[in-house]
């Protein structure tokens, strides 16, 4: 939950572009969405991948495509051209968008499948709920720290050029985070 990945990089970019308060729905969507995903995967959705192995490959393709789209949106969310102010265009991700994003987040899937296979291998409901509760309790403070880091960077992003450079850097890091997904 604290390590760099698509959620945290997007939250840092959102914190830098929109501030902590406007990013709050995005943070809550990540925390609650991932917890919900853990529960649903833990109680049986993982069986889909076992029954239909091609569904995992489809998920990978959709995930990569969506993350590339989000990276493009971040990279091109520049400030108002020619205004001299570093006020970003666009809006932060909504609660629902962040909840839904968890289902195409490759790092989220990796974390969920690993945690559930190690700590709830028998798909026992109590074990699944315990794993989800632990992640739920840890997740929000972790994602908040990335948003706060982004907000702290606002004082450095005072010109159009700096904001554009920051957004392009965050988008590039988001694309680089796909490297493990693309490995055979």
Feature annotation, model-predicted:
Residues 1-57, 112-135, 147:
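Juxtamembrane transmembrane-helix termini in multi-pass membrane transport proteins
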Residues 30, 98-102, 135-139:
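Residue-level signature of transmembrane alpha-helical cores of multipass secondary-active transporters
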Residues 76-93:
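Flexible cytoplasmic inter-helical loops of multi-pass small-molecule transporters
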Residues 50-79, 139-146, 156-184:
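Selective transmembrane alpha-helices of multi-pass membrane proteins
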Residues 2, 36, 72, 103-106, ...:
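Hydrophobic/aromatic residues within the transmembrane alpha-helices of Major Facilitator Superfamily
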Residues 88, 92-100, 126-130:
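Alpha-helical membrane-protein architecture signal
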Residues 40-42, 103-113, 172-184:
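Hydrophobic alpha-helical transmembrane segments in multi-pass integral membrane proteins
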């Amino acid at each position: 939950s604290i390590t760099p990945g698509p959620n945290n990089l997007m939250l840092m970019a959102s914190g830098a572009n929109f501030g902590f308060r406007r990013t709050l729905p995005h943070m809550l969507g990540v925390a609650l969405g991932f917890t919900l995903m853990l529960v649903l995967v833990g109680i049986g959705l993982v069986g889909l991948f076992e029954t239909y192995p091609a569904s995992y490959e489809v998920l990978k393709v959709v995930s990569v495509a969506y993350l590339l789209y989000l990276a493009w949106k971040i990279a091109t969310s520049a400030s108002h051209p020619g205004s001299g102010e570093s006020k970003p265009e666009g809006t932060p991700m909504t609660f629902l968008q962040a909840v839904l994003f968890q289902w195409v987040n490759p790092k989220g899937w990796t974390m969920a499948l690993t945690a559930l296979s190690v700590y709830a291998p028998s798909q026992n409901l109590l074990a699944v709920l315990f794993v989800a509760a632990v992640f739920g309790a840890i997740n929000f403070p972790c994602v908040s720290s990335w948003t706060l880091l982004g907000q702290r960077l606002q004082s450095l992003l005072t010109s159009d050029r700096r904001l554009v450079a920051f957004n392009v850097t965050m988008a590039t890091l988001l694309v680089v985070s796909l490297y493990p997904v693309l490995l055979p």
